[in-house]
């Protein structure tokens, strides 16, 4: 079940303030954020937002196709290093 249309999309207040400030200035600089739950809105298009993945900030360039998704979707928190290899020599007798 999605969020109510009456409420509108969730965007962290501090992140929204930074976006509005940069849009007013017309500058494009990297914005660091820990708010992975914030929804990408049209005002964010063209900005680079560094989203925290638990270890570091991953730079995410926001395009029009990303509008409506969450910031956390574009900064994976887990790294897949492959399945464990089986030791076939130990099984022989």
Swiss-Prot record:
PROSITE patterns the UniProt entry points to: RIBOSOMAL_S19 (PS00323)
Gene3D superfamilies tied to this protein: 30s Ribosomal Protein S19, Chain A
Keyword check for Acyltransferase: no
The organism's taxonomic lineage, starting at the top: Bacteria, Bacillati, Cyanobacteriota, Cyanophyceae, Oscillatoriophycideae
Species this chain originates from: Microcystis aeruginosa (strain NIES-843 / IAM M-2473)
GO MF term list: rRNA binding; structural constituent of ribosome
Alphabetized Pfam families for the sequence: Ribosomal_S19 (PF00203)
PANTHER family per record: RIBOSOMAL PROTEIN S19P FAMILY MEMBER, SMALL RIBOSOMAL SUBUNIT PROTEIN US19M
Family: Belongs to the universal ribosomal protein uS19 family.
BP GO terms, sorted: ribosomal small subunit assembly; translation
Keywords: Ribonucleoprotein, Ribosomal protein, RNA-binding, rRNA-binding
Coiled coil regions in record: none
Family annotation (SUPFAM superfamilies): Ribosomal protein S19
GO cellular component, one term: small ribosomal subunit
Top-level taxon in the UniProt lineage: Bacteria
Entry-linked InterPro entries: Ribosomal_uS19, Ribosomal_uS19_bac-type, Ribosomal_uS19_CS, Ribosomal_uS19_SF
Protein name: Small ribosomal subunit protein uS19
Stated role: Protein S19 forms a complex with S13 that binds strongly to the 16S ribosomal RNA.
């Amino acid at each position: 079940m999605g969020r109510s249309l009456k409420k509108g999309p969730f965007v962290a207040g501090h992140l929204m303030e930074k976006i509005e400030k940069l849009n007013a200035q017309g500058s494009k600089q990297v914005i660091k954020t820990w708010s992975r739950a914030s929804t990408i809105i049209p005002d964010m298009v063209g900005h680079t937002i560094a989203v925290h993945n638990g270890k570091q900030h991953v730079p995410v360039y926001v395009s029009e196709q990303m509008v409506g998704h969450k910031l956390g979707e574009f900064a994976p928190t887990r790294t897949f290093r492959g399945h464990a290899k089986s030791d076939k020599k130990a099984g022989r007798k």
